[in-house]
Design a protein with these regions (language model features):
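Conserved N-terminal phosphate-binding loop of PLP-dependent enzymes in the Aspartate aminotransferase
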Residues: 1-430
Length: 430
């Protein structure tokens, strides 16, 4: 069967034929390729087409797909049993690795998804402070829990529905919205609601409305404001964690939050996430505190094995982040060179191995700037990139993920694809 036929069948069985909306390729007007396997820097569809992968399962595959050490660890763990619903030494070992890499994680809990990690962190912050209000930023995405589906990014932004039906107004009445990279908007909220705000949650690098870096002083400003008002500062590092640096964005920018959520890389590609932070806050979590959180599959031994293998690889290979920076800078240069060569009205944003191209003539520093990008031009760029053998996110509002498995030949092919895509997207859509 080919992707079109599988997709038709999938649409009879699953909403939109997919298990996560952006995978349906609606934003680019195409049928999604159905994937058969992946290895290293490549992903293969059911027709046998090989693509250079810049999605990387939406971030986890920082070292490439099916890394031998990770596969070996998963296999060994699965042979012993796929789930116990009981504590294991593997959980302790992984927690120690996380704490070594990210010292602010004094205590932590393992869960199954980024959504669950964020949902739990917010509940704990509310329990710790005795307050109800949460501050989030427009365009930032923190999973699909009800209270955070307000002016959200990622798939909601892709589908042009930043709020979700099915969420009672009462669930979002305690969610306050600030503007990313705008400290004044944050200060105004705290001046009005400061004694009611339990936590402020932020993607330290916004990566779910495309990649938008924090401006100088923004993250430190958030740290100062939350400290002044006694609110918990939560960094959502589901994407940035272990990607920008071994210690995540908090290490990269030198700003320490009270709590952090991790996902994607921390599970080595398996369903795994972690939340945690200061000991006095995490002491509120059951069974030693009054905030309840539980999960049958939390700390799943197979996922724990994958995450442990992944973090060990990142810790042992001290040059991996230098290589990622070199490869990412080279791809960024290819984008910027083609933009200049073909006089394309576009902006390229990059932080480490995360980047985005926006088809707009204004610098992209905020959600409002993001919304000026021409989506038809992005769709044309996407179609040419796919035809050139590049597997990239089918949405303007998702990141371009660089991985360490990319070879010199892959980079050269990518440079040629970018040149072709920006040439054609400019000529046909400008």
């Amino acid at each position: 069967m080919n992707s079109q036929k599988i997709f038709e069948k999938a649409c009879e069985l699953m909403p939109g034929g997919v298990n996560s909306p952006v995978r349906a390729y609606r934003a680019v007007g195409m049928t999604p390729p159905f994937i058969f396997r992946a290895k290293g820097a490549y992903i293969y569809d059911v027709e046998g087409h090989q693509y250079v992968d810049y999605v990387g399962s939406w971030g986890p595959m920082i070292l490439g797909h099916a890394k031998d050490e990770v596969v070996k660890a998963v296999t060994a763990a699965a042979i012993k049993g796929t789930s116990f619903g009981a504590p294991t030494n593997g959980e302790v070992e992984l927690a120690e690795l996380i704490q070594t890499a990210v010292p602010s994680m004094e205590m932590m809990r393992m869960v199954n998804s980024g959504t669950e990690a964020v949902m739990s962190a917010i509940r704990v912050a509310r329990g710790y402070t005795g307050r109800d209000y949460i501050v989030k930023f427009e365009g930032c995405y923190h999973g699909h829990s009800d209270g955070l589906l307000v002016k959200a990014g990622s798939g909601l932004l892709t589908e042009n529905v930043p709020d979700s039906a099915g969420v009672p107004k009462a669930f979002t009445d305690t969610t306050l919205i600030a503007r990313y990279n705008d400290l004044d908007s944050v200060r105004k909220l705290f001046e009005q609601y400061g004694d009611k705000i339990a936590a402020l949650i932020v993607e330290p690098v916004a990566a779910n409305m495309g990649v938008v870096p924090p401006e100088d002083g923004f993250l430190q400003g958030l740290r100062d404001i939350t400290k002044q008002y006694g609110a918990v500062l939560i960094f959502d590092e589901v994407i940035t964690g272990f990607r920008l640096a071994l210690g995540g964005a908090q290490s990269y920018y030198g700003v320490t939050p009270d709590m952090t959520t991790f996902g994607k890389i921390v599970g080595g590609g398996m369903p795994m996430a972690v939340y945690g932070g200061r000991r006095e806050i995490m002491d509120c979590v059951s069974p030693i505190g009054p905030v309840y959180q539980a999960g049958t599959l939390s700390g799943n031994p197979v996922a724990v094995a994958a995450g442990t293998a992944m973090l060990k690889l990142l810790m042992e290979d001290t040059a991996v982040y230098e290589r990622l920076e070199e490869k990412s800078a080279r791809i960024e240069h290819a984008f910027k060179s083609a933009v200049e060569k073909y006089h394309v009205k576009a902006q390229v944003n990059r932080v480490g191995s995360l980047m985005s191209i926006f088809f707009t003539d204004r610098p992209v520093k905020s959600f409002d700037d993001v919304r000026t990008s021409k989506l038809a031009q992005f769709a044309q760029y996407f179609r040419v990139m796919k035809a050139q053998g590049m597997y990239i996110a089918p949405s303007q509002y998702e990141a371009f993920f660089v991985n360490d498995a990319l070879s010199e030949a892959d980079l050269q092919k990518t440079e040629k694809a970018i040149d072709a895509a920006l040439s054609q997207s400019f000529n046909e859509c400008s």
